[in-house]
Structure formats: structure tokens, C-alpha cells
Amino acid sequence: VKWGIADFIHTFGHTPKGMWLPETAVDLETLTVLAENGIAFTILAPWQAQTRGLNWNHPYNVRLPGGKKITIFFYNDAISSSISFSPNATTNADQFIDIYLKDRFNGDGSDELVIAASDGELYGHHQPFRDKFLAYLLDGALSETGIQTTYPARWLQEHAVEQEIEIREKTSWSCFHGVTRWSDVCG
């Protein structure tokens, strides 16, 4: 965590507000270490919440030992899986918005957040020209829809997070069996 923070400061010139956990592998000890090092949030998969029936378009706080807390954002599984595993989903940004984004909001005018998570190497390495898809999506196609782009640190500056949840200990995004893929045979 300290190395990640130091690298972020070296690269971007300021301390990070959040941190992506590798494979979103998480437990309370890890969240506590993040909070103790000034990290305010991380992003997890929806199935990493112990609490059920949540609105994934809003972040939640997790109470940590010692009276600390950390905010958890959840990525949208359907959108993220389509981006990562369905090459046709990311060929046309306008169609992507129509198929994957427009129906994700409740339409009542309240602020909602839809997070897509994918591996960075997807854009241009695994899928040729997906970097251009992403650039047009963010800098062109979305501007005509009323959907605004943001990022978690900015969201936290503009919105209070009041609800608390519990996480499922020792889980990750990439394995429904938890984190045993790194210490044992998965499954």
C-alpha cells in the first residue's frame, strides 16, 4: 500500500484518495490498512458485499476496527463483463450507450453512479482499437446523452455516503471461491 501511494505521488504529484486492490481481493484487515494510510475508498465487485439488496449505483461505508471507515464503490457487473468478455460490445460507442447505459438509471433525476471496471490492457492490446472506442465514448458520445462522467474521489466531494454495509471477507472479483487461487487449488 505504501509503495502504491509513493508511486502515485511520484507519477501524479498528489496523494491518492482511493486504491484499486489487485483482483479486488479484500478483507477487513486490508481495508483497515488502506484507511490507516489515508485511502478513502476502493472499488469491489457486487458479490463482495455481505449485505444483500443494495443499490449498486451508490457507494457505502464499511466500519473498520478502531472507529475508522472506508467507502466502497461497486462496479456494474453486467456492463463490466460485457466490456471485458464481449468484443462486439466495445466496437461502437453510440451503440454501447444505447444498449448498456441508458437503462441503468432510474430516471427520477437523482444522481446515480454506474462504474465500469475492466483491465487496462483491453484497450488496444487485447482488443485492437478499443482505445479509440474509449476515447470517443468519454470525449464525444456521452456528451450528447446527459450522462456525465465522473470519478469516485469527485463523487465523494459532492455526495455524502450515509449507509453502511459489511463485506464478504477474503473475496475477489475473479474467483467466487474467495482468494484460495493464490494459496491453494481454486474450486
Predicted ranges, named:
Residues V1-I70, D111-E112, A117-S118, G124-P128:
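Gly/Pro-rich turn-and-neighbor structural signature
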Residues N57-S80, P87-T91, Q95-G187:
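Active-site and substrate-binding clefts of carbohydrate-active enzymes
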